[in-house]
Amino acid sequence: MLKTTPLNAAHRGMHAKMVDFGGWDMPLHYGSQLDEHHAVRRDAGMFDVSHMLTVDLHGENVRQFLRGLVANNIDKLTVPGKALYTCMLNPAGGIIDDLIIYFLSESWFRLVVNAGTADKDIDWITLQSSQHAPDLTITPRRDLAMIAVQGPNARAKVWAVIPDSKAASEDLKPFQSVAFGNYFIARTGYTGEDGFEITLPADEAAAFWQKLHAAGVAPAGLGSRDTLRLEAGMNLYGQDMDETTNPLESGLAWTVDLKSERDFIGKQALLEKPVNQQLVGLVLLDKGVLRNHQKIITQHEGIAGEGEITSGGFSPTLNQSIALARIPVGIAAGEQVHVVVRDKQLAARVVKYPFVRNGQALI
């Protein structure tokens, strides 16, 4: 039996193509994945992300607990409402999950974790809490829904639906949030566009979704969500990284604090293990399409090497095939590699991602 979000009936009412997404019954598209992609890049689209799990941590020692739990430095969070993107690592430095942490008060931090890892994450956090912070209260919030409204006109359309929220949210900078009535409004997203991710009571989600639709926000499914995040150069857990890879070889070194004296789970392993691989962007030069798991052949300073595409596909904004790929270190942007597609080797150029940000091509 598939799990459903509070918006399941709304998706079906909009004739969504529904698919099994990690055990959840989720919309792939509502007719045209391409139109949904362009709506987000050019105007505003909305995604049901209620399958992701909000987890509230309460207790007097939450900050100290998180200092040891995650790789990024939780002490960057000094102003209530500020958010931090980070990885949670195992002792070997492998990525258990990537998540966002919101600082709400010294005794209340909010985590948003991926749907496919939610149970594993809760088990891990509970285990670590039992050892290091037994008084911590861990509350999974399945009573909440989350809707992401993304695009250059996204914020204005949210304000049209919740007029009173404008004063509270218009000065939010990226990775800041504010509570407004029953709404928790964060200026975050997974598309490379501006917008809000809005958390609200599950029983209010369907009415809010319909109001957004009436205000001209296009419903968008998992298909366009994936092409948008790929263009934005944003990692997808389970494809671009997992427990067998670490942040330093996954393009996430910027989320790891190795400079402070603070210790965290996985830090020692990261310090000891040489980094032999890197995550890069690829743009296909020959005719074809880049796909996940395709093999890459590299040549660098006379040494042959191999890599693999972690996320590949067609970019509607750029009108060409792009990918994220893990290849040997040392190969720089501008160099060429070859991708094995069936029995052919297709040329691709290594680029620095993101490929697209705020509607503009960056390559």
UniProtKB/Swiss-Prot annotation:
Class in the EC hierarchy, top level = transferase
Annotated Gene3D superfamilies: Aminomethyltransferase beta-barrel domains, Aminomethyltransferase fragment, Probable tRNA modification gtpase trme, domain 1
Where is the secretion signal located? none
What EC designation does it have?
A: 2.1.2.10
Q: What's an example of a GO molecular-function annotation for this chain?
A: aminomethyltransferase activity
Q: Which reaction does it catalyse?
A: N(6)-[(R)-S(8)-aminomethyldihydrolipoyl]-L-lysyl-[protein] + (6S)-5,6,7,8-tetrahydrofolate = N(6)-[(R)-dihydrolipoyl]-L-lysyl-[protein] + (6R)-5,10-methylene-5,6,7,8-tetrahydrofolate + NH4(+)
Alphabetized, the UniProt keywords read: Aminotransferase, Transferase
Q: Does the keyword Amino-acid biosynthesis apply?
A: no
GO CC annotation terms, alphabetical: cytosol; glycine cleavage complex
A Pfam family the protein falls into:
GCV_T
Query: Which InterPro entries does the record match to this protein?
Result: GCS_T, GCS_T_bac, GCST_C, GCV_T_N, GcvT/YgfZ/DmdA, GcvT/YgfZ_C, TrmE/GcvT_dom1
GO biological process terms, alphabetically, are: glycine decarboxylation via glycine cleavage system
Assembly:
The glycine cleavage system is composed of four proteins: P, T, L and H.
Similarity annotation:
Belongs to the GcvT family.
- Tell me, in a sentence or two, what this protein's role is: The glycine cleavage system catalyzes the degradation of glycine.
Q: What is this protein called?
A: Aminomethyltransferase
Q: Which gene encodes it?
A: gcvT
